[in-house]
Amino acid sequence: MISVFDMFKVGVGPSSSHTVGPMKAGKQFIDDLIEQGKFDSVATLHVDVYGSLSMTGHGHNTDIAIIMGLAGYLPHDVDIDLIPTFIEQVKQTKKLSIAQGKKTVNFDWDANMVFHNSFLSLHENGMTITALDAERNVLYRQTYYSIGGGFIVDEAHFGQEEENPVAVPYPYQYAEDILKHCQENGLMLSTVMMRNELALRDKKSVEAHLHNVWKTMKACIEHGVNTEGVLPGPLKVVRRAPSLYRLLQANSNRLANDPMHVIDWVNMFALAVNEENAAGGRVVTAPTNGACGIVPAVLSYYEKFVGPLTQDVIERYLLAAGMIGSLYKMNASISGAEVGCQGEVGVACSMAAAGLTEILGGTPVQVCIAAEIAMEHNLGLTCDPVGGQVQVPCIERNAIASVKAINASRMALRRTTNPRVTLDKVIETMYETGKDMNAKYRETSKGGLAVKVVCS
């Protein structure tokens, strides 16, 4: 079962597949060395990066993420402020402290961190880490694939089914299965998801995780609207959320007469989160970093304009959104490198639309209709980040998709006819569309806006 613990993970920006996943892979590699009793013999580490990870890796801080993972840190607990100093020290000394200081090994950044233009065979995001002893003998080598949303899998386990899956009361593979459970038992999506979660862990742990997810999202918005400046990288993108926030605060009475001013607030919420992500801040995968602004922006819309935002509302929103996200993870992809941005922003839009419909009192059928509408109108969305960075068009795209999610929810709630397209069919279509998409438009920065906009 794919849990809300899988779909919503606290991490660091700017990318779940290119930053969070590689950091986890680096940490896993070190843990494996220790478990195999080879750690003490390591003298040098070497990293090879392939495919989309390589082509947009510098802009996504993939190399930095791998190093921090080898250093013994994970995305949810790494000290963000420590990273620049640590990386500079590695580059200057050509030494890398691994496993949180347990050992120092040789690491020449230019020679031991190699970005290749080629792809590995199993997935678009591949990386191989090699440990060598003092005589340059290979002690251990492992290839990892970062398959989207911060999920990683090593070569030996790629494509394999989950070992010893936990039996849940309401198993599902498709939206059709979920709707059947809801109809037969008189349950909402969020209730079905919660009862499945309780097969994995106690209720207190689930509630604590969901509370921490929303707390982190809120903190991200707060930091985003109060942090001025220019985002890292050659694009020199100026943060827009703070100025928009000031405008909305200063003109609240006048703007209240504008029926569209709600959109300005939704835009601001999304911009704040994604600007924090682009700056390498603390964010929550929802389901990815590149699309991390949509789920919090839509719940913030509810809090400001619908409310009140109780703990029960937060939980039901995230449970329903997470359940819809799991359908895409199981039956399609949430990796921009695999299916384009429809797998990131498209999925996040679908998740947020479903979550909002759930807490607005929609039926399970309406929740799935909202999710379907949101994805249907993101089909074919390309992933063409300018300069290989998660800034243009990514930041603004989250704002647009947040508004689209709200609209999808409203359309689903007010629909009086049966839909012609089901959620399962749109998920199937999204995956096929992504696989048919030219690799130029799947997070390689080789086509689209990425080759039309000049970094200066």
Roles of regions detected by a PLM:
Residues I2-F5, V20-M23, K27-Q28, Q36-K102, ...:
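Structured, active/binding-site neighborhoods that engage oxygen-rich ligands
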Residues M7, G11, V266-N274, Y317-G325, ...:
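Short alpha-helical scaffolding segments that buttress acidic/His motifs in well-ordered protein cores
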Residues F8-G26, A279-V298, V339-C349:
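Conserved phosphate/anionic-ligand binding catalytic regions in large, soluble enzymes, centered on
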Residues S17-I34, P296-P308, A353-G361:
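Alpha-helical support elements that line or immediately flank enzyme active sites
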Residues P75-R254:
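C-terminal regulatory domains involved in ligand/effector binding and gene-expression control
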Residues K203-G340, G448-S456:
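Accessory "access/gating" subregions that flank catalytic or transport cores
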Residues L309, A320, S326-A399, M411-R420:
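Hydrophobic alpha-helical bundle architecture
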Residues R420-S456:
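Extended hydrophobic packing segments that form well-structured cores
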